[in-house]
Amino acid sequence: MRLLTLLLILMFALVAAYFCYSVYFYGGRWIANPYNPRISSQKQHVVMGTLTDRDGTVLAYTDESGTRRYNSNAATRKAVSQVVGDSSGKVSTGADTFHAQYLLGFRSSIFERLADAFTGTTQRGDDVELTISERLSRYISEQFPRDKRGAVVVLNYKTNEILALVSMPQFDPTDMDSALADEAAGALVNRATQGLYPPGSTFKIVTMASALENLPDLNDFAFDCTGYYPVGSYSVTDGSAHGVQSLSDAFAHSCNTTFAALSQDLGYEMLGKTAEEMGFNKNFMFSDLIVYNSSYPIDDLSAEDLAWSAIGQGRVLATPLHMALIASVVANGGVMNEPQLVKSVTTAQGGNRALLSHASSKRVISADVAARLESEMIRVVKSGTGRRAALDNGYVVAGKTGSAEASNDKSVGAHAWFVGYVANDNAPYAICVLVENGGSGGAVAAPLARKTLQKAINLGL
């Protein structure tokens, strides 16, 4: 009986410990529900804190009347709209709602609240400094192809800070009636974190990593690309016949048939394992933001399904942020780190609020494989499909283009992708550019990546 009692006590303690852990690390997700009555209640007696970008530009604040206000510049408001959100909580993934735990004072200590009560001071929430750059975000918004949807993500792969998280189209938080009336346009959706797209040839980074990790003698690998590769009852095709190629040649030319053939040697178990190590099918429970889960089919795939998956088509789906993280993995020598959106939190008294941990990191590929991938991605930009992403002045860009077929009830198009990073220690920027139905990744996404990376360098972020 005593043993049973001890077991019950231990089980209760474990459940309580897990509950406390969940509240501390993921409590923001519970609080962030716009229908949470605690949020509306807290807004009645707490002055909501200020949101700024990394340079101190005010993105949102509360005026003397208690009304939530946003930056006076319309271009700025729109450029950061999905990151900041709105006062009504319609964009529940925006910082105004998701970080209400800070902004509305939920993390204030009992001593801070007692001090406010004794002095008769209205409680004020914490001020939150985000890692994004308003200047970079606005520049990306201006350069993005007009009337196109998509997203651009820029990360500092050394610090894990998100420098830009731009989604198109955008909305104005001061005019939510228009945003809601035009909801079909999807401006309230953050495509950088919530948009799930076939990654196309950018997924060849994952397939290449899997081959390097699992297949022997790849230095002697050669494949004769005739322009099509029959597999099952289908054929995987290329725009032209590349002839006999090494694996390095095939990656630089983004040869679909070579990677389709490579998938048959790998099999779905090895390729699926690498994809999952890289974050596919994983639950992204990040501290600072909500990111939808990318997917890779891991059931017993047919030969043709496996071939399509190896080139990022079929049932493979990823968010632009995830693909930027994959670029960061290569840049970081095979380690994936948790992205950071909150740079600092300051209390009403001027003190520093302890941040939630951003220490989550995991080795997902070996350092040797990452080094080989970097050299292959550099070749893509120097002489392959990503030449339009190249920078001058000694900056070396490593990258991969993609043109992912996508269809709806009305038409079939191609999403333009570029995924890569600057391989210089003094400019540690990783990037993902996605232009929905933009066509060629090399022609559309790569030039925007080049402009964006150059702007980040010029700003000294």
Regions found by a protein language model. Give the residues of each.
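Beta-lactam-recognizing serine transpeptidase/beta-lactamase-like catalytic domain environment
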Residues: 55, 115, 158-200, 206-437
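Periplasmic/cell-envelope proteins involved in peptidoglycan metabolism and beta-lactam response
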Residues: 1-180, 187, 196, 201, ...
